[in-house]
Amino acid sequence: FGLERDVDFIALSFVREARDIQQLKALMGEKVGKVKIIAKIEDQEGVRNLEEIIKESDSIMVARGDLGVEINVEDLPNVQRTIVQMCAEYGKRVIVATHLLESMIHNPHPTRAEVTDVANAVYEEVDAVMLSGETTVGKYPVKCVEFLRKIALKSETIPGLQFAKHLRNAGNKQQLAVAAVQLAEGVKAKGIVVITRRGIMADLVSNCRPFSTNIYAFTNMSQPRRTMMLNRGVFPFKIDFSSDPEKTLQTAFRILKDREQFQVGDKVVIISDVLAEQRVDSIQIRDIPSDDIASEASHEPQ
């Protein structure tokens, strides 16, 4: 049903072992890799087999409602932290869900403890925090989203726990992404621009959890643009790629200037695994040009 309607994600409940994900992949056929799998960790067996589940999945959800019933409630914070840390080390997306602003089902303001809980998830550098009953049956669904956004934005102003500094099995592309983030932070770049078809390079850059730099990902495909929206710190756009990579870059710059993300003279780092019709991994540093200069000049990588 879902695959016929071109869903972007499938969330599988009560995943207890990697074989559960493998069975789902067998049903998905050629959609494997295009449609992303979110494994929901909801009981003790899932926690015990966490590492093999993470390796087999695209994303993990810490489903705290059922998980808090299946394990000792006092163990829940440590289990959440373990899941988040292991996902960061393997470069997998992680979502913290359920009971974030539970009191707002009935009340117009969250409790102080709920605010701290959401902030702690942001400090752990999760990719997403997800509301459940607050927006499905609650009296104040819009206020819940507004509070969640305000708490997250404020919490993002201080550095997180940086679990991603200990990436496991980082291949060449991941090392390239690490280098791009280090370069961006070193030169105090205003942003990292990623040119990618399938979103893989944007995933890898997001895995590095840059603190002071947003990631602007440009793809020419609709589904990767949608799936990249789950990645922490990534702002995805869909554009037509030109056979001239310089024109593609200038289109990206123009969009970001129009949206007031960049100004003329801002320094940016560009990382790409796609140039023209060939796959080329590269990193560049650029200063955002004026429209007049952009239309006349072709820039060489620095």
Kindly label every feature range from the protein language model:
Residues F1-Q302:
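Non-catalytic helical/linker scaffolds that mediate oligomerization, partner binding
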